[in-house]
Regions:
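Short, ordered, surface-exposed loop/turn motifs in non-cytosolic proteins
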Residues: 1-8, 108-112
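Short beta-strand and strand-turn-strand segments in soluble, beta-rich domains
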Residues: 4-9, 45-50, 129-152
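Short, acidic Ser/Thr/Gly-rich low-complexity loop/linker segments typical of extracellular
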Residues: 6-21
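Structured interaction patches on ligand/partner-binding surfaces of diverse proteins
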Residues: 11, 38-67
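Short strand-edge motifs at loop-to-beta-strand transitions and within beta-strands
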Residues: 21-23, 62-64, 163
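A short, solvent-exposed beta-strand micro-motif common in secreted/extracellular proteins
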Residues: 27-42
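A structural motif detector for short, solvent-exposed N-terminal "entry" segments of globular domains
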Residues: 68-122, 215-234, 238-253, 313-315, ...
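Solvent-exposed beta-edge/loop recognition patches
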Residues: 136-340, 355
Length: 356
């Protein structure tokens, strides 16, 4: 169990016994309490996680109850996410990328996977959306969803391999794009979140060697590529159990202009990561603890930083195993140098264009 005061930087860690943990030496204040553990059962490893935010710990003997959920560890995990962009004077954001890694010992197929940025509140979090759907707590919601192509066996990902989804799979280090300020060349990405070459806001978005994704849901303002918040957001990787409809969207009963979306069953989600704009964002988290019990933040927008998953261990063959406790606060760290395939992640065999 971890008790964190993000205002003071104070962190107290303790262990549980029979589901109960006791902590001493806590200075009165407002804390976030997170719990994480793992358990093996039936040949599978389950992650147990939960959190409570805005917990006032004032008097001795205060008790806090944290609800926890158990989720089977996923084979595919977000390994690194670069969302901040660069150049605050010119707001360069087209170099965003999402690296997804096979953390298991079995081959996994990327065909048909979907990726989305979820919504749960208005911009300043003063309105938490109320969705008029039965069992709303069993869903997360997204305005835009992109899907990988394939027939089910087209894109194998071996253990230790990763694939990269680029917003735009070009060399962003180019002077004519980011004035040389971007840290990444994305020409080796496996997929890009554009459907075809187009011009947007006066910029020619070229169709590159990376495989085009399909925008299967567009419930909000239409853009030809996938831009997520440079302040951080809530990212989900999922495999839909039924076809996604690009119509008949759900609108929150207290919606503003962002409150129309498509529901995603939590049971379909493979991995989720939560990033907030700063420590104050920890007070209102948008993902259920069954998906992510924590969050992380970079030093700001347009600062050229990424978030990367920590290494848990290395297998005898040199393949890395990444930490996955379903708690981004524990599992990720901020990096000043966004990198594709950090720590030696391998390239899928079907990416034949990476060295062209």
């Amino acid at each position: 169990m971890k008790i964190s005061n993000f205002a003071t930087g104070s962190v107290i860690e303790t262990t549980t016994e029979n589901g109960i943990a006791t902590a001493v030496g806590i200075i009165p204040g407002v804390y976030t309490v997170t719990v994480s553990a793992s358990q093996n059962q039936g040949g599978f490893t389950y992650t147990i996680a939960g959190s409570e935010s805005n917990v006032s710990l004032i008097a001795d003997g205060a008790e806090v109850v944290v609800r926890v959920d158990a989720v089977k560890e996923a084979a595919l995990v977000f390994k690194e996410i670069y969302y901040t962009g660069v150049d605050p004077a010119n707001f360069y954001f087209r170099d965003q990328f999402y690296e997804i890694y096979n953390n298991s010992t079995e081959v996994v197929y990327a065909d048909g996977l979907c990726i989305a940025e979820t919504v749960f509140a208005n911009y300043d979090k003063s309105i938490i959306y109320e969705w008029p759907i039965e069992n709303a707590d069993q869903y997360v919601f997204a305005r835009v969803i992109w899907q990988l192509p394939g027939d089910g066996k087209t894109y194998p990902v071996q253990p230790g391999e990763s694939f990269v989804i680029a917003q735009w799979a070009t060399n962003h280090k180019a002077e004519n794009l980011s004035k040389g300020l971007s840290p990444v060349d994305l020409t080796g990405a496996e997929f890009e979140a554009i459907e075809k070459e187009t011009t947007f806001n006066g910029i020619l978005l070229t169709d590159n060697l990376a495989i085009n994704m399909k925008k299967v849901v567009q419930a909000g303002y239409a853009m030809p590529q996938w831009l997520t918040s440079t302040d951080g957001s809530r990212y989900v990787l999922f495999k839909p159990s039924k076809p996604l409809k690009n119509e008949d969207f759900i609108t929150a009963t207290n919606a503003d202009y962002q409150g129309t979306a498509r529901e995603i069953a939590i049971s379909d989600v493979i991995d989720a990561v939560q990033a907030v704009n700063n420590e104050s964002g920890m007070s209102v988290l948008g993902l259920p603890t069954a998906l992510d019990a924590g969050a992380i933040w970079c030093s700001g927008a347009y600062v050229g930083e990424s978030i990367a998953r920590k290494i848990k261990e290395t297998r005898p063959d040199g393949t890395k195993v990444y930490q996955d406790t379903n708690n981004t606060s524990n599992d990720f760290e901020v990096k000043k140098d966004p990198q594709l395939r950090r720590y030696g992640a391998k390239v899928p065999s079907w990416n034949t264009w990476i060295n062209k």
